Amino acid sequence: MAVIVRPTPSPTPYPAVIGSFLRARRMVQRNMLVYRHSWIVIFSGFFEPLFYLLGIGYGLGTFVGDITMAGGYVVPYAVFVAPALLAQSTMNGAISETIFNVFFKLNFEKIYDAVLATPLGVGDIALGELMWAMIRATIYAVAFIAVMLVMGLLISPWAVLALPATLFCSLAFCAAGLATTTYLRTVQDFDLPFGLVIMPMFLFSGTFFPISIYPEWLQFLVQLTPLYHAVELLRALTTGVVEPTILAHIGYLAAFGSVAMVLARRRLAAKLVK
């Protein structure tokens, strides 16, 4: 744990918020340098949802046929599943960076102790890691949307907003992952968020079938999860079934991400600064 004694900061020509982003940018640049010779690793989590799309969306979709969505809209099963797997792809990018990589930087490599010896503070570290994780999640999203476009799974003009919408998804997942990793003590603890939270969310958040088939109490629990709101938001845009409720999904993801980010910063400060 680093013991930090900071001098009185010198005047800065930038407003506080802009100054924080400029400092956090250094963390992003550092991560880019680290990955410059192993960039293929960034795409590792992209392939899992792609294989699900090919295996389940098309393989199982041949037997399932069409799916009736809210409002009576009928779409092919692959069209129904694809935006949910886009949400999962975004989540994979966020979680891979914020849980795995941040955990090792924090507990083994002691990267942040070294960073705190520079003008950067804990808030700059948290913001920088959030920005980098969102970049990685966005790369996943861009690649997956390109696959959906080639496969003819974007059936609405609203789909042009799918990529901007993934930014709200990545904010929620990146901030949540960053906060979660501060509670993990050993490598074995990875099983807890993945086995008890991430996998159940993936299976039950309307990924493969509408949540209307669940009992009401389970529907309520599912609607509390960020992945459900990400799936519903992206599915509405890519299928054209756009209703005012998408604003609620956006609001939820933005609020969830903001609260999780505040928690992540406080937890990092408690672990790094004495």
Regions found by a protein language model. Give the residues of each.
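Junction motif at the cytosolic side of a transmembrane helix
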Residues: 2-8, 63, 238-241, 251-274
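Short, membrane-interfacial amphipathic segments enriched in basic
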Residues: 4-28, 217-228
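Short alpha-helical transmembrane interface motifs in multi-pass membrane proteins
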Residues: 11-14, 40-41, 53, 80-84, ...
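Membrane-interface helix starts
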Residues: 29-48, 247, 273-274
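Membrane-interfacial helix-loop-helix junctions in multi-pass membrane proteins
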Residues: 34, 202-259
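Pore- or pathway-lining transmembrane helices of multi-pass membrane proteins that form conduits
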Residues: 43-44, 186-205
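Hydrophobic alpha-helical transmembrane segments of multi-pass membrane transport proteins
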Residues: 51-56, 76-150, 177, 196, ...
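Alpha-helical transmembrane segments and their short interhelical loops
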Residues: 122-194, 241-265
